[in-house]
From Swiss-Prot:
Na(+)/H(+) antiporter that extrudes sodium in exchange for external protons. It catalyses: Na(+)(in) + 2 H(+)(out) = Na(+)(out) + 2 H(+)(in). This is Na(+)/H(+) antiporter NhaA 2. Disulfide bonds: none annotated. HAMAP family: NhaA (MF_01844). It comes from Pelobacter propionicus (strain DSM 2379 / NBRC 103807 / OttBd1). One of its GO terms (molecular function) is sodium:proton antiporter activity. GO terms for cellular component: plasma membrane. It is a multi-pass membrane protein. Belongs to the NhaA Na(+)/H(+) (TC 2.A.33) antiporter family. It is found in: Cell inner membrane. InterPro entries: Na/H_antiporter_dom_sf, NhaA. The chain crosses the membrane at residues 11-31, 45-65, 91-111, 116-136, 145-165, 171-191, 197-214, 287-307, 324-344, 353-373.
Length: 382
């Protein structure tokens, strides 16, 4: 039974199942799907809110664990100078899609679509990370490279939303970020006192961080990203972040061990809540978003990764140039933040729906990455 469950997790079956169910439901009964997804059932709580703002907090927390471990001595991104290359890739992965989008839009001559330039800037952490694990194997340094790139990418995406797509009804209230800072200080203090359970870090520091981001009108799902690095951890002998270490009983390892399975299967909820887009919505902006993600991300990440090398910032150990190219392709998977920006960039519901279709179609980047990985004979590392 455990073997079968691990197989489902390995091939991201829960997430794929959620996406498929949402697509069928939204196209067969769009009104019913929208009512299920967005209708509050207790106060302001809806299925969409629970999935995106509460459950995804755990997902980003697990992602933060992987980044923390990869930055430890012996990790794929240690010494920290090795993180400079993926951060360069992040910059290229933002600028590339923006330039491609604006360039293509200038060619088609539709000024009403110009405001969508921010849609293809972010990489979907959940889907890109899972696709990378399938392409490279969970122990490949390209996975932690792409994970760091995707997290930084989404941080830039959220900044773009706050700066360029403000909601007049819910403007950013920066003062509330002091509460997130307080949460970080609480987590730091718990670490100084050598608290050996992860629960106080999550319940105290995590709650403060979540409330601060929520009240600031930013994405509260990123709350644990600011808390996880403060959890006490043990240095691992293995340099691969996905290697299991049964002797590691540190708070960081316990959090990962106890919540990773929950997150892997809970991604069904994420797919169900976000993938309900009608196929009849396809329009010009669909292709602008899709091409910007597929081409802009690949060229930008690969080009800026090579530029970082020229400047003396090497890739992680064991990561070849062909791995960087494939990682750039996989990073073209735009989803969550792209869907969110689509709703902020356009007020016209027809254009908005078409833009969301482009974000949905970018799931093809994961498939293209897998095929390219086979063609380039990428060796999986488990």
């Amino acid at each position: 039974m455990k073997k079968h469950l691990n197989l489902l997790r390995e091939f991201s079956v829960p997430l794929v199942a959620g996406v498929v169910v949402a697509l069928f439901w939204a196209n067969l009964d769009p009104a019913g799907y929208r009512a299920f997804d967005s209708t509050p059932f207790w106060g302001s709580l809806s299925f969409h809110f629970i999935s995106n703002e509460l459950f995804m907090t755990l997902f980003f927390g697990i992602a933060a664990v992987e980044i923390t471990q990869s930055c430890m001595p012996g990790g794929d991104l240690n010494p920290i100078s090795r993180a400079v290359n993926p951060l360069f890739g992040t910059l290229g992965g933002v600028l590339g899609p923006v330039l491609v989008y604006l360039g293509l839009n200038a060619l088609v001559g539709l000024p009403e679509l110009r405001n969508g330039w921010g849609i293809p800037t972010a990489t979907d952490i959940a889907l890109a990370w899972l696709a990378a694990r399938m392409v490279f194997g969970p122990g490949h340094p390209a996975v932690s490279y792409l994970l760091l790139l995707a997290v930084a990418d989404d941080a830039i995406g959220l900044a773009i939303i706050a700066l360029f797509y403000p909601d007049p009804n819910h403007p950013v209230v920066a003062a509330w970020l002091l509460l997130t800072l307080l949460g970080m200080l609480v987590a730091w203090g718990l670490g100084r006192r050598r608290v050996r359970s992860y629960w106080p870090y999550i319940l105290l520091g995590g709650s403060l961080s979540w409330i601060g981001l929520h009240q600031a009108h930013l994405h509260p799902a990123l709350a644990l990203v600011f808390i996880i690095p403060f959890l006490p951890h043990r240095l691992r002998e293995s340099r691969h972040l996905f290697d299991d270490d049964p002797g590691d009983r540190s708070p960081l390892a316990q959090f990962e061990h106890e919540w990773k399975v929950v997150v892997d299967f809970g991604l069904f909820l994420f797919g169900l809540a976000n993938a309900g887009v009608e196929f009849s919505s396809i329009g010009t902006v669909t292709w602008l978003v899709l091409v910007s993600l597929l081409v802009g991300k690949t060229v930008g990440i690969f080009g800026f990764g090579l530029l970082a090398e020229r400047l003396g910032f090497r890739r992680p150990r064991g990561m070849k140039r062909r791995d960087l190219l494939v990682a750039g392709v996989v990073a073209g998977t735009g989803f969550t933040v792209a869907l969110f920006v689509s709703g902020s960039a356009f007020s016209d519901p027809v254009i908005q729906a078409a833009a969301k279709m482009g974000a949905m179609f970018s799931l093809a980047a994961a498939l293209i990455g897998m095929l390219l990985g086979q063609l380039l004979r990428i060796r999986k590392v488990h």
